[in-house]
Amino acid sequence: GYQDMKSEYQKMIAGEPYHPFDPELRALSQTARQKQATFNEEVDPVKGLEIIKGWFGSTGENLYVNTRLVVDYGVNIYLGENFYSNWNLTMLDVCPITIGDNAMIGPNCQFLTPLHPLDPDERNSGIEFGKPITIGKNFWAGGGVIVLPGVTLGDNVVAGAGAVITKSFGDNVVLAGNPARVIKEIPVKEN
């Protein structure tokens, strides 16, 4: 029936196997490359942020993204209010990447949603899939943090420089290492 007629884009954002060379996805990717190039060459940060606001799935009113941004599509990125990112932010958004209010992202951080089949024949066939990344409010990532596909983080999470976050964690924790683990609980004042 009609339910079987999902587009490759719909399959992709749902985390189902999809063909990345689908014409609709190629066109979306090409548009993203053009916007990425325009943003990365823009010297005026106000103009740069207008590009991001008109491109990403959603953003807060107040945000700052430094240049050397790399994304797959951009349209699957949802940022809360007061988002800040330093240089070289990579967000590979084949599935949605959602980050809550007041995020501070250090340089060279990567948010990676794409996955490939482990079986070599399946992988070589070109089929891909992904898993979304969802992060709560008040996230602080030091330099070089990597967040892998399918990770959900709660509120008030701090990730130390170089942390590789391979699985989900709750609220009020400091993560460090590869693979990242909780090295400290954060005592939060009751409002």
Segments from the language model and where they lie:
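Conserved catalytic segment of ABC-fold P-loop ATPases
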Residues: 154-157, 170-172
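Terminal amphipathic alpha-helical/low-complexity segments used for targeting or macromolecular assembly
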Residues: 1-62, 180-191
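Flexible, glycine/small-residue-enriched loop-and-beta-strand segment within the central core
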Residues: 69-153, 178-191
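Acidic, glycine-centered active-site loop in nucleotide-sugar glycosyltransferases
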Residues: 169-171, 176-179
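Short-chain dehydrogenase/reductase
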Residues: 64, 140, 158, 174-176
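Arg/Lys-rich RNA-binding interfaces used to dock onto structured RNA substrates
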Residues: 53, 67-70
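Short hydrophobic beta-strand element within catalytic cores of glycosyltransferases
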Residues: 164-166
